[in-house]
Amino acid sequence: MEKKDIRVLALDLDGTLTNDQKVVTPATRAALDAAAAKGVTIVLASGRPTAGIMPLAKELGLDKKGGCILSYNGGAIIDCATGETLYRKQLDAKYVPQLCAFAREQGVAIVT
């Protein structure tokens, strides 16, 4: 694939987009700006809730130049410029008690 064919750049946050201090370095910012200038859609991907990612999206200017947030480990995709939910998939609440009981039986925690 040639670079001109790249349309989307999806980046995990912690340790990928940000460094050990949870900071986006100037070099990374410049690379993101260059990609966006070429029409590449920047997607911030995380297991965090949307509200936990939006401040970084705004800091990077994705609310103005476009981009998306992929939150809840892929459970939601939000357009940063409009706030529109492009995709949402939720677990039906009726399954939660059964899943919690199973997790307790297995001695594991449920991480969302």
Question: Can you say where each PLM-predicted feature lies in the sequence?
Answer:
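A general structural-boundary detector
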Residues: 2, 19-22, 40, 86
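Short, small/polar residue-rich loop motifs at catalytic or cofactor-binding pockets
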Residues: 3-6, 29
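Asp-based phosphoryl-transfer active-site loop
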Residues: 5-22, 44, 99
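Residue-level recognition of oxygen-bearing side chains
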Residues: 23, 27
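Active-site phosphate-binding/coordination module
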Residues: 28-112
